[in-house]
Regions:
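Accessory alpha-helical/coil subdomains and C-terminal extensions
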Residues: 143-163
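Extended interaction regions within the primary functional domain
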Residues: 2, 12, 124, 162-165
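Cys-nucleophile CN-hydrolase/nitrilase-fold catalytic domain and related Cys-dependent amidase chemistry
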Residues: 36-146
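Active-site-proximal flexible loops/turns
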Residues: 23, 56-57, 176
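N-terminal active-site segment of His-dependent metallophosphoesterases
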Residues: 1-42
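Single conserved hydrophobic/aromatic residue that forms the stacking wall/gate
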Residues: 165-176
């Protein structure tokens, strides 16, 4: 079968895991299972829903340190699982930076967290109360975060240069 990357295309998948609200360990395993499934079908990029590691409806639990630590652990589990895989994954979780809570999309590739992009426009109507819990990333300067075991870019204006090497000619993919 011919690789579509040779024609400038990549196969992108959108995956929705069956999650348990607040059970970050279970949700991370489900995300890893789906990542394997789409990877086996040839996807080179997979996007998961916002806050998929914790669940969207955690409300005030988003501020609990136990939840935030579990979400980070789930993110690391997913990142470690991706090592050796030629797939870019985007997953959602709550993340505290500078004392503020953000709803972020984490970009994972080959075992590493490449960066996090905070949500800029937070709905605050009907059943959506995101502004109650999260801070908008709209005016946030892009920076480089140092965690205890990794570093990554954080902000809304990030460009990643990732090499997809499993094709006949290595291709650079700019993810904006």
């Amino acid at each position: 079968m011919e690789n579509i990357m040779n024609h400038g295309f990549i196969k992108v998948a959108a995956a929705t895991p069956k999650i348990k609200v607040g059970d970050c360990s279970y949700n991370a395993k489900e995300i890893c299972r789906l990542m394997d499934e789409v990877y086996e079908k040839g996807a080179q990029f997979v996007v998961f829903p916002e806050l998929c590691i914790t669940g969207y409806t955690c409300s005030d639990l988003f501020w609990q340190s136990t939840m935030l630590v579990a979400a980070k652990h789930g993110l690391r589990t997913i990142a470690e699982h991706s090592e050796g895989m030629e797939i870019i994954a985007i997953v959602g979780l709550p993340y505290i930076y500078g004392g503020k809570l953000y709803n972020v999309a984490a970009i994972i590739y080959n075992g590493e967290i490449q960066g996090m992009v905070p949500k800029s426009y937070l709905p605050n109507y009907s059943e959506f109360y995101e502004a109650r819990h999260f801070t908008s990333g709209k005016d946030l300067e892009s920076i480089y975060c140092e965690e205890s075991d990794c570093g990554f870019s954080f902000g809304t204006n990030l460009i990643f240069k990732l090499s997809l090497i499993h094709i006949s000619e290595p291709t650079r993919l700019d993810v904006i």
